[in-house]
């Protein structure tokens, strides 16, 4: 009887993969705490991961999320975990975390290059798609013109409306 091929998934946070800083500073900057990059996944690194028997790499935290780093528009500090933020507070489903790129304007090209290198190393790619986990300040700077931001057309005068993307407390300002 022929044995079915087994999928072996290697999950990795690119932010941590190539980061050589071992002593972290609470709420530290990227200089203090470091940050991994897509480019850290070199052909040699990918071949070593493949040698583990890996068939798929799950790149976690790739989609742009709320952050207080200086690459793009910052989010309110009270709603961001530390400075780097949580990869589960998605700010733009159409974009890539700029902190993971060597050259921010080319971040999508750098991600596409990572996908190509991974495929060339004989593995498939998985990334997180985190529906219903969005940042309080969701804003897309990479969406197509016909796409509206989440909450853009919400009726904020109602606590709940089936056509809204978010819940609201009418008449009260969010105080953080």
How would you describe each model-predicted region?
Residues 1-124, 132-143, 148-157, 162, ...:
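N-terminal structural segment of carbohydrate-active enzymes
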